[in-house]
């Protein structure tokens, strides 16, 4: 073909890969393995440009590693459960299963049209029984170990949708979808004991050398380990007490009040006889409990009749119900020191609560104005009785000893992270394999009865899950006693499925959760996904991996060796979204320019970690470059088809210069490949093509060598055109299984070099000189040059500064 027909070229290449199972991975202990994985998508129905960029990054890495001779695993699957499928099913009057499977089929064809090197023989969809059977089995093992449990928990309850909402789904006190006023409701929920692994999850962050520092910091903060004291405040005229955790026991003598959560048992008890307090608690139930919102929303409180006794001074301390205290954190109570905590200060200002300063600056110079703000730094204790004059460290130890000796406190290590709530009151999810028996209590399903299948013959409505209304699902015999019992109707949070899919790819058809292949492939060598998953998904996957390790299923401690967090795709400076009307349909681009152009632009426009700004001219530019590559191959077809090798003894001056530039760019490309700086690798390809086009009278052998190197560097980015041209020229059948080029150090040895000549720091001329010249010979050549003689004339040379093979500066006066 004389013209670049991308449609024909891409169809031919994809057909070849299909017929030859080019991407199928097979365990081979004689080869170094490389497991490359992009985060699996939710099957929404169509690909967007974010998908294209994410999977192109992964494909470039996978193809490059394969050309390095490694045994590459590059799988793909579908995160197929979740509420969006229910919503779509209701809207389109289809079952979630039908809707999901239809979307998967279409999106798979879109991925194939982009030439991604996925091993589809390992495809998993989390809604398939063959997948979720094993997470049900695993849950039962965790339940038997006491790592999975059920307890009552306060949740955001949507009375219209009849389901629990995450904090993020509550907007201005209303359900994000139904618009109903949200209620705080206590219902039974299932949890995994991630807190049992909090220390290890925190410690092992230090092992993650291949992760971005930003992600590691986010996980460290989310786990939130803090060491402090738990202090006991006795309730006056009662045998009850309130326990509070503090990391600042040095401020204990400055406590002005205690704050308790609206759901605290003491608050609920008093509300029985106090209608105003009950109204306040009801109001608190309608506000967001997200930490970000708690930090900014108005601080509100209600003074109770309860009084506590200070554990050291013996003074009485008022107890307030406060909207910023969460029952789910610590004991649901805090000690408030308005003089030394800004949040407590704001609350005290609003309700005219007295401040007591107990810390002064260490330098004795800083002036404090507690009428304006709290003094929150550590310093020296004052107004603290026997503890006066102590610094933070000494005060911590002294107060700890006092509390311990008098049974009024103890040292505690607290974590910000709390056990993972894994149950959802929705239909489209993996059934939790537990049974409720009146006689036996909670009983796991027998393993031989797994999977507990999700019924597909359901009628979905907008209100809650239909599982409780399906008798054949709900009613079962107790596995223990055989008496009538009922199934659990909650389903797993979809994070449960996405926390172990990477491991199932290693043995997708195994008749057990994981087989020995898992330890060949794991850990994942390169994991690619958005930084928005830094905490939830990536932390849960790390937790799950440790659970699987302790079950004897894997031997490694961590799931992902290296993590690449790609930036967003922007248009007009904003993230692409349908609501903004700034989306670009990848399919339209593929139809207009071809998959290789779309792939090339997405890699060239910005480094992977940075956001990519969409540019129509950038896409045109990528397409023009590929046409130049094709035209060079077509124009030089007969030359490139020759089976010739380089004879370095017969190279012309231009040949040597061209080879130097080609190999210098190859060397840079290899360095940038290993750093995942793909935009500069593409730039190196463009420079190599320019070199081949710009030098006159290049020998056929140099043209062939240079173009062969170009195609191999470019192949991971634009596999279709490179596959086609590799075959057309006769270089081989399959470029994917060709060795990536290596640097010829001899080619990088210059016969000549370009010397910049300066006089008094100003550039005057540039001279080409023999690379073998010594410093003295270089000076001699420069000073004998006619142009230089003209510039110097009769001036006196003070000194000569020489930077070898780069620059010479002649200082004259």
UniProtKB/Swiss-Prot annotation:
InterPro entries for the chain: aa-tRNA-synth_I_CS, aa-tRNA-synth_Ia, Leu-tRNA-ligase, Leu_tRNA-synth_edit, M/V/L/I-tRNA-synth_anticd-bd, Methionyl/Leucyl_tRNA_Synth, Rossmann-like_a/b/a_fold, tRNAsynth_Ia_anticodon-bd
Instruction: Kindly state which keywords UniProt assigns to this record, in alphabetical order.
Output: Aminoacyl-tRNA synthetase, ATP-binding, Cytoplasm, Ligase, Nucleotide-binding, Protein biosynthesis
Q: Name one GO molecular function term.
A: ATP binding
One cellular component term (GO) for this entry is: cytosol
- The entry's protein name is Leucine--tRNA ligase
- Membership in a protein family: Belongs to the class-I aminoacyl-tRNA synthetase family.
- Catalytic activity entry: tRNA(Leu) + L-leucine + ATP = L-leucyl-tRNA(Leu) + AMP + diphosphate
Q: Which HAMAP family match?
A: Leu_tRNA_synth_B
Output the superkingdom of the source species: Bacteria
Q: Name one GO biological process term.
A: leucyl-tRNA aminoacylation
């Amino acid at each position: 073909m004389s013209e670049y027909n991308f449609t024909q070229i891409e169809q031919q290449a994809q057909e070849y890969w299909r017929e030859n199972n080019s991407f199928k991975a097979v365990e081979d202990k004689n080869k170094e393995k490389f497991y490359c994985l992009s985060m699996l998508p939710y099957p929404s129905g169509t690909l967007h440009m974010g998908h294209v960029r994410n999977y192109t990054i992964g494909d470039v890495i996978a193809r490059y590693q394969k050309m390095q001779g490694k045994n590459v695993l590059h799988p793909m699957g579908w995160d197929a459960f979740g509420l969006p499928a229910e919503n779509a099913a209701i809207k389109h009057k289809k079952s979630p299963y039908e809707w999901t499977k239809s979307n998967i089929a279409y999106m798979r064809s879109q991925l194939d049209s982009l030439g991604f090197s996925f091993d589809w023989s390992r495809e998993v969809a989390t809604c398939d029984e063959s997948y979720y059977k094993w997470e049900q089995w695993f849950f039962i093992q965790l339940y038997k170990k006491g790592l999975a449990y059920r307890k009552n928990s306060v949740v955001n309850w949507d009375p219209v949708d009849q389901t629990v909402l995450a904090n993020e789904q509550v907007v201005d006190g209303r359900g994000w979808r139904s618009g109903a006023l949200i209620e705080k409701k206590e219902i039974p929920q299932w949890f995994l004991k991630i807190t049992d692994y909090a220390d290890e999850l925190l410690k092992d962050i230090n092992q993650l050398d291949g992760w971005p520092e930003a992600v590691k910091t986010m996980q460290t903060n989310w786990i939130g380990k803090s060491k402090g004291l738990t202090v006991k405040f006795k309730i006056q005229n009662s045998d009850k007490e309130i326990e509070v955790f503090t990391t600042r026991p040095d401020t204990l003598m400055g406590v002005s009040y205690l704050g308790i959560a609206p759901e605290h048992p003491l608050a609920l008890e008093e509300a029985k006889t106090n209608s105003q307090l009950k109204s306040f608690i009801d109001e608190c139930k309608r506000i967001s409990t997200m930490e970000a919102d708690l930090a900014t929303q108005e601080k509100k409180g209600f003074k109770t009749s309860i009084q506590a006794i200070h554990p050291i001074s013996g003074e009485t301390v008022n107890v307030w119900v406060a909207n910023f205290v969460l029952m789910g954190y610590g004991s649901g109570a805090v000690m408030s020191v308005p003089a030394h905590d800004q949040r407590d200060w704001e609350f005290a200002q609003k309700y005219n609560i007295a401040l007591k300063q107990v810390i002064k600056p260490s330098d004795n110079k800083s002036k404090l104005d507690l009428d304006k703000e709290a003094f929150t730094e550590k310093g020296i204790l004052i107004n603290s009785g026997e503890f006066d004059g102590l610094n933070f460290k000494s005060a911590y130890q002294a107060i700890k000893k006092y509390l311990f000796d008098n049974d009024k406190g103890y040292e505690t290590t607290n974590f910000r992270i709390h056990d993972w709530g894994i149950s959802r009151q929705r239909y489209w999810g993996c059934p939790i394999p537990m049974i409720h028996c009146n006689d036996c209590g909670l009983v796991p399903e027998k393993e031989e009865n797994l999977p507990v299948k999700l019924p597909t013959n359901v009628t979905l409505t907008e209100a809650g899950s239909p599982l409780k209304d399906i008798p054949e699902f709900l009613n079962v015999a107790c596995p223990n006693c055989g008496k009538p019992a009922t199934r659990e109707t909650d389903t797993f949070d979809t994070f449960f499925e996405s926390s172990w899919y990477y491991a199932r790819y290693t043995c997708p058809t195994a008749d057990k959760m994981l087989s020995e292949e898992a330890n060949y492939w794991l850990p994942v060598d390169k994991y690619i996904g958005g930084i928005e998953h830094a905490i939830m998904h990536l932390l849960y996957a790390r937790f799950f991996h440790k659970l699987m390790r302790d079950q004897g299923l894997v031997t490694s401690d961590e799931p992902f060796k290296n993590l690449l967090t790609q930036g967003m795709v922007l248009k007009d400076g904003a993230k692409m979204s349908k609501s903004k009307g700034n989306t670009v349909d990848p399919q339209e681009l593929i139809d207009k320019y071809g998959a290789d152009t779309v792939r090339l632009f997405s890699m060239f426009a910005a480094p992977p970690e940075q956001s990519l700004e969409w540019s129509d001219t950038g896409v045109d530019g990528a397409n023009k470059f590929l046409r130049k590559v094709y035209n060079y191959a077509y124009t030089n077809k007969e030359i490139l088809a020759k089976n010739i090798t380089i004879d370095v003894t017969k190279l012309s001056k231009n040949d040597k210069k061209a080879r130097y530039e080609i190999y210098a760019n190859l060397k840079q490309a290899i360095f940038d490949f290993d750093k995942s700086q793909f935009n500069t690798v593409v730039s190196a390809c463009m420079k190599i093509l320019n070199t081949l086009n710009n030098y006159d009278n290049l020998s056929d052998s140099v043209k062939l060598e240079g173009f062969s190197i170009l195609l191999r560097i470019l192949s991971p980015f634009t596999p279709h055109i490179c596959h086609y041209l590799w075959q057309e020229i006769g270089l081989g059948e399959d470029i994917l299984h060709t060795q990536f080029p290596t640097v010829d150090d001899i080619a990088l040895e210059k016969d000549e070099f370009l010397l910049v000549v300066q006089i008094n720091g100003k550039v005057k001329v540039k001279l080409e000189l023999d690379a073998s010249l010594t410093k003295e010979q270089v000076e001699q050549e420069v000073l004998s040059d006619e142009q230089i003689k003209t510039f110097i004339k009769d001036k006196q040379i003070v000194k000569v500064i020489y930077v070898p093979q780069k620059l010479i500066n002649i200082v004259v006066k």
